């Protein structure tokens, strides 16, 4: 970077922090740095891979496996997780330390495939299947014929759906975060979700928050900061078991667990806090055993962008626990920002959800698979120069704009099936389920939130 830039920055007023100066310097340096882009061409996306490569190689580490160079050695997929690759000469050592290596000693709350089914027949009395499901009725139809059959059904459904309401909120606990980041879209989403939690009585020092699909736990950290922001000394009287549980099957760096504890200790009013994390798939999680040593007073389930079938598995994990049994008052509520309905699994939907879809005309696995394809139209991008009114020779024969509108209807249908199912199951327990847009679509296309709250709130 030119010396004059550094001199200009150094001469700026003292109120500009060192961090701000460093960010400005980095911004200039990034412009000058040549990006060594991977040369692998992704035919499906009609573009090159965006990942960085080493200066002496043509491809990034993930695509070296597709184009091995004899003088460099062979790159092979990891047998434990083929989403990453490794040099063949290092494979033996890699398998000993790979993060995808199965655990030898599972935690006591691990029960393989526990939540792929319901432990008790909760649905027997709550809803009767009308018997109209037919898994084989569409087996003879090709993709184009499936579109021709189900697009008119979705168009008819569209006319019967009232628009979702907006519930855009915010919480002052994220004011510092919003001032720190230049790209505010995640902070805006977090602020609205937490503001909605407060509005619905889900934000309190007497809650234990269980974050599913937590990643590094960023949502929980800002929930904690917001709880601390609202905290009064009188709120601590008789309160206990405040804390956070983290559930994620992935390996996450820069986890927020310790920062949450630090924030609580450094708060004006010091708070005792419990955190607990498990690297586990939701389908294998025994919620009661995970919570046993904590024994929380009230449990609130939260998640930001819980992907596809993970939302349905979360519902099942709660239904398989004591939290949603009639004699328990530990369940405090739930707030989930949903995403990726195109990767939902038909066999993981609650039986009531499947029955709802069947009542709307989607009675087979093939029909659900075509519904998922249509769902993806709601969030797929438009290439530069694409005319919204052009079909672009799409197999459906629809324009981009028509596909986007139908994609939103398909997404809404799956979401409504979840609301229908959970209302049947939680209404008798004194809860109700609601759904709303929590931010504008310009912030995120995945802007739908599902919330379960006590009727008394």
UniProtKB/Swiss-Prot annotation:
The family this protein is said to belong to: Belongs to the methyltransferase TRM13 family.
Naturally occurring in which organism (per UniProt): Debaryomyces hansenii (strain ATCC 36239 / CBS 767 / BCRC 21394 / JCM 1990 / NBRC 0083 / IGC 2968)
Sites where the protein binds Zn(2+): 78, 84, 94, 98
PROSITE patterns tied to this protein: ZF_CHHC_U11_48K (PS51800)
Subcellular location field: Cytoplasm; Nucleus, Nucleolus
Chain's role: tRNA methylase which 2'-O-methylates cytidine(4) in tRNA(Pro) and tRNA(Gly)(GCC), and adenosine(4) in tRNA(His).
GO biological process, one term: tRNA nucleoside ribose methylation
Primary location class: cytoplasm
EC identifiers of the protein: 2.1.1.225
Name used for this protein in its record: tRNA:m(4)X modification enzyme TRM13
Gene designation: TRM13
Reaction equation(s) it catalyzes: cytidine(4) in tRNA(Pro) + S-adenosyl-L-methionine = 2'-O-methylcytidine(4) in tRNA(Pro) + S-adenosyl-L-homocysteine + H(+); cytidine(4) in tRNA(Gly)(GCC) + S-adenosyl-L-methionine = 2'-O-methylcytidine(4) in tRNA(Gly)(GCC) + S-adenosyl-L-homocysteine + H(+); adenosine(4) in tRNA(His) + S-adenosyl-L-methionine = 2'-O-methyladenosine(4) in tRNA(His) + S-adenosyl-L-homocysteine + H(+)
Tagged with keyword tRNA processing: yes
Spans annotated as Disordered: 1-29
Signal peptide per UniProt: none
Highest taxon of the lineage: Eukaryota
Molecular function GO terms recorded: tRNA 2'-O-methyltransferase activity; zinc ion binding
Gene Ontology annotations for the cellular component aspect, listed alphabetically: cytoplasm; nucleolus
ZnF CHHC U11-48K-type span: 75-102
